[in-house]
Every structure is written in structure tokens, then in C-alpha cells.
């Protein structure tokens, strides 16, 4: 899982919640960890020495490995505009990333070139409107170095992360990190016999925003075909292939090279499609029947869905079951401001997610023809 941002939340009623762990990676990890497969999960991202202790504690409590969270030397002063022109969303040499355990050694080298300050942890305002629209405003200076922190080069991954059973990455649809995705594809599986002879592992790709302008066909095909799973929300899908029904969106994305497509629709659930078999499922969103599960904050729900979905696929489950795991995990995140306090791996959390999964599975519909 990639990307960590510390969010400062501003709600439509004027209330705020500061210093919340976010960025997509933690929420995806939460969704992944709610699955009964009890997978080990790690995060890869650049953080600063100011990374809040509370955020570190949450990762520990949820069984999320943090070795992949690395410090980044503050030696790249490129502007955001430069990052845009280069088209990579911000790139940095792997040598700029420093394992946190190495920081003390660097601090002791007072006169050495490495004895530099480190970039701060990525931090942003997340402003939610009454109609559900959310606007992100960077508090950390937006430059090439910041974007590199969100998706570090593959060569910075700890050795035990390489050969993982699955990777999940958020990318900009206009500037997909082709080099990173290709590197992760080569790393998948690591010879894990549990995956079977036909499947080395799963690479899941999620756009983290809508396209602001038409995407060239070549870029669209590179984006859709880079992974095994392509999971945009409905607005993101429309920005890529135009308006249409969820089934039409899935088919257009599949025609662009996506193998498994899952179009997430918020309160309307999701539609999942397998391009090879033509199988398509409509999965509802879960809503609690009592007030104990009132909607609190939808930030990160899509990420949690992706985590549960890819965990189901990595376990060898069918497309509809995997999508139900995703929807169940997303519903838990929606009932909390920020990441849930109760750890994903707790028996109580997993039992609640399983209960929701079973309820969703009974209501899931197979789409036949053009309906």
C-alpha cells in the first residue's frame, strides 16, 4: 500500500478534526486487514520526523508494518509546475530516501553531506461540503519532492516487501507512474506457491482524482492495462471514458485494457466486471439499520473498499465475494471520522465486517446482458 498524508478535516458544519491519519494507504490497509485471510500488510511512503506519534500508534495497533515509511532528504526544491511538466507527478532518486533507523547515524555525521534536514510529513486540509464534495488543499509545499514522497521509487521498498502477494497504488490518471507500476509488476509473487501456478500476484491501481482534461488513448490504455485491477469511482471513470451506465463504463475501461474493473459508486455500491469472462456483478453499499452506524465521514471509504476487494481476490475468492468484502470494509470506515479506532484485526471488527459481508452477498446481483 502506498501514500500517507496527515489530514486536517474541515466539515460542512464548521467542525474540525486535526492530525488524522490519511492519504489512502492507511485506509486501504485497514480494508485489507479486516479480511479473515489475516494478511500481513505494509505501507510505503515518505514521511517526516514530525510524523505524529498517534498515527504511528494506530499503525502498530492495526498490525500494519511501517518499515516502508522512510525519511526523505530535503534537497529537491523543484516547483509543482516543474513536476507537472515532467509528467511524472514528482520523482526523486532512491538515494533521497532514508530508513528511519538510519537517521541517528546521519545526525552523528555533522559535517557529512548526508547530515541534512528532512522533508516534513505530507499534510493537507480536507474540506467536505454538504453535498459530499471534498476539496484537498496542501499545507505542505506542493513540489516535486512532495509527490515523490507519496509514491516512492520501487527500489526503496524494504526487501521483504518485494515479492508481495499484492500491491495497491493510487495514481494520477493523466500522469500514471508507469515506471513504478512496471517495477511492482516485476516484483509480484516472489515465488509464493500459495498463489498457484497461474497467478503471480495482484497489482491494484486506483486513480486518486478525476482527469481534468481528455486523456489520450495511449495514456488511457497504459493506465488501464498496468495492473490486474483498475478501480476508479464513478466520477473518475466518467472523466476517462465519458458518461454512461456503470456497465458501460466497465466495458469501455475493459476495452482500454483493464482486466478486472470495479467502478465504485458511493452510496449506490459498486459494479465489478471481469473482462476475460464477461462476468459482472452489482454490489450494494451497506447501511446499518439502527443509529449505531450513522454516517460520519466518507473520506477514505473508496480506499478501504479497494483493500477489502483485493484481499478477497488475493484469497482466491470469486469476483462478487471480493466486492462484498470491499463494500463491508468501506461501510465501517464511513461510520468513523478518520480511520476507525478499533483495530482492523480485532476479532470484534472482523466479525462485524463478516456480518456485513454476508448481508451484502445476499443482495448482490449478477448483471446479464445490457441491464
Q: Predicted segment positions?
A:
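Short catalytic helix/loop segments, enriched in acidic residues and glycine
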Residues: 14-30
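Short, hydrophobic/glycine-enriched beta-strand segments
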Residues: 1-5, 204
